[in-house]
Curated annotation (Swiss-Prot):
The lineage of its organism: Bacteria, Pseudomonadati, Pseudomonadota, Gammaproteobacteria, Enterobacterales. Confers DNA tethering and processivity to DNA polymerases and other proteins. Acts as a clamp, forming a ring around DNA (a reaction catalyzed by the clamp-loading complex) which diffuses in an ATP-independent manner freely and bidirectionally along dsDNA. Initially characterized for its ability to contact the catalytic subunit of DNA polymerase III (Pol III), a complex, multichain enzyme responsible for most of the replicative synthesis in bacteria; Pol III exhibits 3'-5' exonuclease proofreading activity. It comes from Salmonella typhimurium (strain LT2 / SGSC1412 / ATCC 700720). It comes from the Bacteria. GO terms for cellular component: cytoplasm; DNA polymerase III complex. CDD domains: beta_clamp (cd00140). This is Beta sliding clamp. Signal peptide: none annotated. SMART domains: POL3Bc. Belongs to the beta sliding clamp family. It is found in: Cytoplasm. Forms a ring-shaped head-to-tail homodimer around DNA which binds and tethers DNA polymerases and other proteins to the DNA. The DNA replisome complex has a single clamp-loading complex (3 tau and 1 each of delta, delta', psi and chi subunits) which binds 3 Pol III cores (1 core on the leading strand and 2 on the lagging strand) each with a beta sliding clamp dimer. Additional proteins in the replisome are other copies of gamma, psi and chi, Ssb, DNA helicase and RNA primase. PANTHER family: BETA SLIDING CLAMP, DNA POLYMERASE III SUBUNIT BETA.
């Protein structure tokens, strides 16, 4: 195996394929990248057995086919440490891979390519193409609600659901729920899968905001995404995700509307004096007015009074202020609509001008 490539053509692919690699690999070869040269292309692959990222680099200079695996971190650090515009010549000699550039020379240990694990072949059941911006919006709108190391393992991920000509993402940790739907050009069969948390983060990392469309394939145990020269595959979480439709409040009869930024700033200020552990704030809603209060064990108090649009009956309700702020940060809109029922029912929060995303937050007894 032999190839020569410019540093700039290698850096981004190396960074992307190193993404799935954890801190301390369980098997030594999982800390390595698979390098394969064939048909004028260099393929780089990184995996942690749960997911895999493949990058392709076109080789314009003379090369010889072959394959090997090298320590990912060291190879990336060497390439990154070389000066801009450097040409990198790589050659496999016995069980060593030689890397040369200018007057620098490195000899890396290798492990056989045949030992590198690859995800089993699988059949795709649903396929569709969408703009990168659409996928980015779907993930950004819901990502923060995923659970973190919950024993209900199926919550440590994101539900991707196709229905008609819509793609939907849902995430919940049992205290709050986020759902976002975006239209697709094609009509698709109804299908839903749970992508693990780490897979969602990697999928987000591969979106470069460019014009290249994203092609998605979903099988019974895997999801694959192609964009440009990158192919990402992740195993799915086996489990039953809660039905978000049953979590949305049934018929909230009280609607409050207010400016998103004004609300965000008021909640952020009140949060300073909320209990550091429980993060509780109280909301008092009356005609066209919202009062937010917070206090802590040191008997310190915060009070914010805002003019809002509200015509329902007076009520008070408590929330974890962090959950509300997460929603307001994700909404990025001008006016927010908050739909309330009573002090013990969850509320629904959405952009007043668009129904594409909805957020549900459970109340807190204060």
């Amino acid at each position: 195996m032999k190839f020569t490539v410019e540093r700039e053509h290698l850096l981004k692919p190396l960074q992307q394929v190193s993404g799935p690699l954890g801190g301390r690999p369980t098997l030594p070869i999982l800390g390595n990248l698979l390098l394969q040269v064939a048909d004028g292309t260099l393929s780089l692959t990184g995996t942690d057995l749960e997911m895999e990222m493949v990058a392709r680099v076109t080789l314009s200079q003379p090369h010889e086919p072959g394959a090997t695996t090298v320590p990912a971190r060291k190879f990336f650090d060497i390439c990154r440490g070389l000066p801009e515009g450097a040409e990198i010549a790589v050659q496999l000699e016995g069980d060593r891979m030689l890397v040369r550039s200018g007057r620098s020379r490195f000899s890396l240990s290798t492990l056989p390519a045949a030992d590198f694990p690859n995800l089993d072949d699988w059949q795709s059941e649903v396929e569709f193409t969408l703009p990168q911006a659409t996928m980015k919006r779907l993930i950004e709108s819901t990502q923060f609600s995923m659970a973190h190391q919950d024993v209900r393992y199926y919550l440590n991920g994101m539900l991707f659901e196709t229905e008609g000509s819509e793609l939907r993402t849902v995430a919940t940790d049992g205290h709050r729920l986020a759902v976002c739907s975006m239209p697709l050009e094609a009509s698709l069969p109804s299908h839903s899968v749970i992508v693990p948390r780490k897979g969602v983060i990697e999928l987000m990392r591969m979106l470069d905001g460019g014009e290249n469309p994203l092609r998605v394939q979903i099988g019974s145990n895997n999801i694959r995404a192609h964009v440009g020269d990158f192919i990402f595959t992740s195993k799915l979480v086996d489990g039953r995700f809660p039905d978000y439709r049953r979590v949305l409040p049934k018929n909230p009869d009280k609607h409050l509307e207010a400016g998103c930024d004004i609300l965000k700033q008021a909640f952020a200020r009140a949060a300073i004096l909320s209990n550091e552990k429980f993060r509780g704030v109280r909301l008092y809603v009356s005609e066209n007015q919202l009062k937010i209060t917070a206090n802590n064990p040191e008997q310190e108090e915060a009070e914010e009074i805002l003019d809002v649009s509200y015509g329902g009956t007076e009520m008070e309700i408590g929330f974890n202020v962090s959950y509300v702020l997460d929603v307001l940060n994700a909404l990025k809109c001008e006016t927010v609509r908050i739909m309330l029922t009573d002090s013990v029912s969850s509320v629904q929060i959405e952009d007043a001008a668009s129904q594409s995303a909805a957020y549900v937050v459970m109340p807190m007894r204060l």
